[in-house]
Amino acid sequence: MADLSSRVNELHDLLNQYSYEYYVEDNPSVPDSEYDKLLHELIKIEEEHPEYKTVDSPTVRVGGEAQASFNKVNHDTPMLSLGNAFNEDDLRKFDQRIREQIGNVEYMCELKIDGLAVSLKYVDGYFVQGLTRGDGTTGEDITENLKTIHAIPLKMKEPLNVEVRGEAYMPRRSFLRLNEEKEKNDEQLFANPRNAAAGSLRQLDSKLTAKRKLSVFIYSVNDFTDFNARSQSEALDELDKLGFTTNKNRARVNNIDGVLEYIEKWTSQRESLPYDIDGIVIKVNDLDQQDEMGFTQKSPRWAIAYKFPAEEVVTKLLDIELSIGRTGVVTPTAILEPVKVAGTTVSRASLHNEDLIHDRDIRIGDSVVVKKAGDIIPEVVRSIPERRPEDAVTYHMPTHCPSCGHELVRIEGEVALRCINPKCQAQLVEGLIHFVSRQAMNIDGLGTKIIQQLYQSELIKDVADIFYLTEEDLLPLDRMGQKKVDNLLAAIQQAKDNSLENLLFGLGIRHLGVKASQVLAEKYETIDRLLTVTEAELVEIHDIGDKVAQSVVTYLENEDIRALIQKLKDKHVNMIYKGIKTSDIEGHPEFSGKTIVLTGKLHQMTRNEASKWLASQGAKVTSSVTKNTDVVIAGEDAGSKLTKAQSLGIEIWTEQQFVDKQNELNS
């Protein structure tokens, strides 16, 4: 047994060393096959001799049993956000405030990693708990998923009790590999590495997270009691010695001009990095000076985050293609010479509509400027006429639908051209794709390519046909093995139990969005009651305007639609509202019965999370500001809704005020 114990220790040392070389230093000294061989040897020993399995065993990285959900846990110390700077003037004002309070200052500049903030707790040197940032006060316990990240030490080099903060991210190489795999499986692609990292860390099955090859950079420690550090730079050096991975592209600078030089350097070099960054974090380096400056309610006074402007690149417009949406809108898309934008290769970008093409004088063959709106959606910003070739072609939208040949129309008051043929194949396929989407019937496994195959094979012609599919229908399709077929049929069966609002939204009734579907489902409770409503009744409902009322009644009066609903009923698709009625919610008086509008970008939660929480407290969340609005919650870059609220004298809360009120209720 002594020999076995020695071998286990040897395997631990070797696997930890090889893992660090591969995942942290990106410089492996042995081939993957050698690592896998040693790992399987250790797994076998632990299976046969469980007494040798330790909490810091390299086998933990493989992942464990799937969880039912993530527990909410309060942070020992709140995870605050940072104030933002968008230009040199913002930074100089920050510097002036600092120097007015503490005099001469040295700054620490660090890359702002574009990922997911996490908090890691260690007891006696062992990693015991990892949380997401959440709302800053409460996060989700994702410990098992974080254990699969090789850059996170399961055991520190010293037996300290400490909590560190960092940013979990997905390297670009892992992101490209993941999206290639998802594309092969006809699954929805991730928009960017940040979304991929967040989605990977919220997998209930940690084995799936382990396959995603995430990494992490640690950037701070909560309590410096056990640290021999007098500055942020020394604290990062100490973290390195303890076995943590910090970002080495940091720099100490003596003044704000040094900060600006650092920003200029990494603005030009950010694409050379193997991971995404979205800005620069600037901190007062001296820890005593940090203590002297303290905190506001939402952020430290001694730090700020400079956010990069949206990156713009020049490429060539090769062609313009058209797509037809489920409501018949014809949208032009730019086909581009592939170019890197904000870390990903872009070959297509939105042109929105014909008016935009003409207003911006965009022609096929032009050199055009492309950016990602919010670093996510590529769009053509403008053409460069001075570079225009002689053979550049002015684009004219067609007069007839490229899918069905029906004449296109422009409805009064709209900029888009529209195909109004109800039997247009492109619209029908897009309608099927919409029906199975996440906010509608949420049928996992029915991707675009499979739906197109099913439609072209005439196995489905309308949404009800989905519930009539059999194993014999699905098995002959491309890339559909037995396991995939079984999973898809199970997902279709599960979708039958969705609440009425999912079905209403999935039917694709024009002008009827997620919120209005929820309102109608809650109000009428069954599809049969909805089939009898009139426009006059609907317009009396708050949040249901004239357009929605007319569209819903016209749609539900159609005999073909009534036959479709009966076809769904025949397959026992649920047509009843299953949610909790707002009138039954005993919310807090601060929110109950109030009409609230969310505007601008929220940092401590998503808009959807905020809306759900407000609804749980009996509030009514609407999309427009009127004299009946009680409160407007204004996030970053709030625009016309905030201006209108100010002109109407409506109460306005910042995001932090909203979060503070949530925390008061939870305490």
Swiss-Prot record:
Zn(2+) binds at C401, C404, C419, C424. Residues 586-667 form the BRCT domain. The keyword Kinase does not apply. It catalyses: NAD(+) + (deoxyribonucleotide)n-3'-hydroxyl + 5'-phospho-(deoxyribonucleotide)m = (deoxyribonucleotide)n+m + AMP + beta-nicotinamide D-nucleotide. The active site is at K112. It is an enzyme of class 6 (ligase). GO terms for cellular component: cytosol. Belongs to the NAD-dependent DNA ligase family. LigA subfamily. This is DNA ligase. It comes from Staphylococcus aureus. The lineage of its organism: Bacteria, Bacillati, Bacillota, Bacilli, Bacillales.
